[in-house]
Amino acid sequence: QGPVLGFDLDVVITGSLDDLLALAPGHVVMRHDWNEARKGRPTGHGSVFRYDPLEHPFLYEDLAADAYAEVERARGSEQRYTSHKAMDNSVFTYIPGDWVISFKYDCNPFPGNYLRPATLPTAAKVVCFHGRPKMPEAIEGYRGSLIRYAKQTDWLQDHWVDRTRADLGAQWG
């Protein structure tokens, strides 16, 4: 009962989630998809989302009623389905862009990625690792691509590994 906060597996929590839970009560909340935003299109990104099953039954009911048609309409994208259904029902709000950020676009942008290690903006609550580098690659440093090059990222080791181990105990990982 109450809101559900969902995460992809390729994210790291770096700040308090209280603001995400309090943002726009009664609305589905997602971050604006980076690629769709650049193209001027309205679509949420599914890496972090909040909804309430009791307040947003249409997310399940419409899909259950005609799954094939709904998947076709959303072009196979669960984030397009979720965000557009909520928009159609006037219960959608974007998460502020500085709360849920992209490692490659916001922490480690080209060409600065060659000059300094990735930075963690102070307002960031969640960092998403969509594409390369993957989280383990970013910790160690990544040399697989000109624009995705990353120096060793110590703050990621701290937030993703060390704090998780402290929370879950030495037997983790």
What do the PLM-derived regions correspond to, one by one?
Residues Q1-T43, R50-Y51:
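GT-A fold catalytic core of metal-dependent nucleotide-sugar glycosyltransferases
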Residues P57-G173:
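Catalytic core and acceptor-binding pocket of nucleotide-sugar-dependent glycosyltransferases
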